[in-house]
Amino acid sequence: MNIFDELKARGLVFQTTDEAALSKALTEDMVSYYVGYDPTADSLHLGNLVLILTMKRLQMAGHKPYALVGGATGLIGDPSFKDSERSLQTKDTVTKWSGKIRSQLERFLDFENGENKAEMTNNYNWFENLTFIDFLRDVGKHFTVNYMISKDSVKSRMESGISYTEFAYQIMQGYDFYELNQLHNVTLQLGGSDQWGNMTAGTELLRRKANKQGHVITIPLITDSTGKKFGKSEGNAIWLDADKTSPYEMYQFWLNVDDADAVKMLKIFTFLSLEEIAEIEEQFEAARHERLAQKVLAREVVSLVHGKEAYEQAVKTSEILFGGGDLRQLDAKSILTGLKAAPQHQIAPDEDLTLIELLISVGIAPSKRQAREDITNGAIYINGERVQELDYVLTDSDKIENRLTVIRRGKKKNFVLTY
């Protein structure tokens, strides 16, 4: 199976400009291709990861990736299917975010070895000294207004209003393709399905200005079985930066993927062969309650994004938090991340309360009688260890890193005391 057929088999091809010509080129030649990343935040996220992994698949097949940071377009903002205009960022912010994109991409793409080693460039390099007059004469004249407003990405904003700044974005992105072709013989652009209009502006400019054929592959919007955009947890993006989304949180996200989506996501987000995924699917369907597909997803993606050690730590954290282990084996940060949904109560470090008084003061038990019953019946745990002494008083050894203590009532009801 050639790389183009594999991308299709994995559900990674939504639209292409000329499928036959593209498939032939990817089979016979080393194709130089690019993906643009506008620095709109200080980290890439799960939505970006689909494209990053697609870039990696093509590089592994012998093709040459160019990662284009939108140092110029990031100052403008892409209007595609946005309800309102993006807020403009400062040059300093865009420059800082651009640097972070590079460091994150280096985890996945090979920037060091071989003829097809990855390269990174910035479209600010060619826009910085391009005058407005030159832009209109050399680029703008190749686009009619009719052509530009026919794009679905622009149509969706016509009634609510779109500034000329954002309206011109598609021409800027089109010019990126032209420049990359002239500088590096780039002939293929990858992007999300919402980018089709901007991307074909590039193939149009390449045809008109250089009499060359450019190719486009758009990746489908990744949705779950209900049609919702995939990649968020409780409305929050899953970031690739460990400081924004911890490896543990990412691990839990994949572990909780719906059964109906698990095999599909294995094809999209892992480098397991399609044959291996078929075997996993067979075992998964035979015993869904064991959640094999989700466990493999969590292992593969967390290891890929954060490394094997971070994955193993996430597993350990999960087992200790929910399997009744000794919480003192974990650091305070891991505990707070894993139990962020649990009620937190702040108490003075020198507060000298018996366990019974503590259970009442933080609302774990409604009365002394109930507190005594819970302790006597073995329902109260401190940092995962059962405590049955009615006169027990917390000591410094119960304070993990002098920051917190976890009290659990029963199997799942956790309370976090902070100092």
UniProtKB/Swiss-Prot annotation:
GO CC entries: cytosol
Molecular functions (GO terms): ATP binding; RNA binding; tyrosine-tRNA ligase activity
Keywords assigned: Aminoacyl-tRNA synthetase, ATP-binding, Cytoplasm, Ligase, Nucleotide-binding, Protein biosynthesis, RNA-binding
Pfam family, one: SYY_C-terminal
Binding site for ATP: K232
Span(s) of short sequence motif 'KMSKS' region: 229-233
GO biological process per UniProt: tyrosyl-tRNA aminoacylation
The enzyme's E.C. designation: 6.1.1.1
InterPro entries recorded: aa-tRNA-synth_I_CS (IPR001412), aa-tRNA-synth_Ic (IPR002305), Rossmann-like_a/b/a_fold (IPR014729), S4_RNA-bd (IPR002942), S4_RNA-bd_sf (IPR036986), SYY-like_C (IPR054608), Tyr-tRNA-ligase (IPR002307), Tyr-tRNA-ligase_bac-type (IPR024088)
Superkingdom of this protein's organism: Bacteria
Residues binding L-tyrosine, per UniProt: Y34, Y169, Q173
Record field: catalytic activity: tRNA(Tyr) + L-tyrosine + ATP = L-tyrosyl-tRNA(Tyr) + AMP + diphosphate + H(+)
Ranges where the S4 RNA-binding domain occurs: 353-419
Gene3D superfamilies given in the database record: HUPs, RNA-binding S4 domain, Tyrosyl-Transfer RNA Synthetase
Compartments, record wording: Cytoplasm
CDD domains attached to this UniProt entry: S4, TyrRS_core
Motif interval(s): 'HIGH' region: 39-48
Transmembrane segments: none
Family as reported in the entry's similarity comment: Belongs to the class-I aminoacyl-tRNA synthetase family. TyrS type 1 subfamily.
Protein's job: Catalyzes the attachment of tyrosine to tRNA(Tyr) in a two-step reaction: tyrosine is first activated by ATP to form Tyr-AMP and then transferred to the acceptor end of tRNA(Tyr).
SUBUNIT field: Homodimer.
Protein name per the record: Tyrosine--tRNA ligase
Organism: Lactococcus lactis subsp. cremoris (strain MG1363)
Organism lineage string: Bacteria, Bacillati, Bacillota, Bacilli, Lactobacillales
Gene expressing this chain: tyrS
